């Protein structure tokens, strides 16, 4: 399926989804939100895809935010619907069951940071700028920013960044736990690709179990998380990949996980 605002390509078991609106700094409009939901659902259903990289076209921005020219025309009910569409799309990424890496160069602001936060890992260029500046427009973050920022960076930092709207650099974002790694701009693609390849070579059942267990524990508490962890652990023992992993360890070789 072709998209108006996205580029989709595969490199082995890694799928790369690129938001391709560089003239708008990859701003999220309703059409792009809908296309992202479709593209990630396709990646979820494709067994050949084991890891996903989410990127923005050009070097100026991952995503500079929502499309303000579109937002300015919305009625209150349309704005609420747009918020829910974005929230549902990002929940779908968070709950995909396959690891998603956000490649952050330039600006990741507003809806862009919200999109990055629903990804499981975030690799940032040293030149990246991150923030939730919605307060300067007279609105609240609408795509989950108030919830995920507090979970990732803590309540105090979330309040500071949302109440002031002041962007931060990649170094501070890393110190807050908001990004996974910070690298020189010229090393960003190599770092992202290496991590994606590492994840794609892992056992898919175990990857999904880890992603789901951490999410469930975070949303429902440690007891629910531990219960799901035990079930996921047991389920792994029904897979050929578990037998391959243990045998490879005993034979001192690299495992070849097939997803079975």
Predicted regions and their residues:
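Terminal peptide-recognition signature
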Residues: 17, 21, 35-36, 54, ...
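Crotonase-fold acyl-CoA enzyme core
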Residues: 92-207, 235-239, 243-244, 253, ...
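A short, glycine- and basic residue-enriched loop/turn
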Residues: 22-25, 60, 65, 71, ...
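Glycine- (often His-adjacent) and acidic-residue-rich active-site loop
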Residues: 56-92, 108, 221
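Conserved CoA-thioester-binding segment of acyl-CoA-metabolizing enzymes
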Residues: 1-55, 77, 91, 189
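Terminal low-complexity tails and localization/encapsulation signals of metabolic enzymes
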Residues: 1-3, 247-260
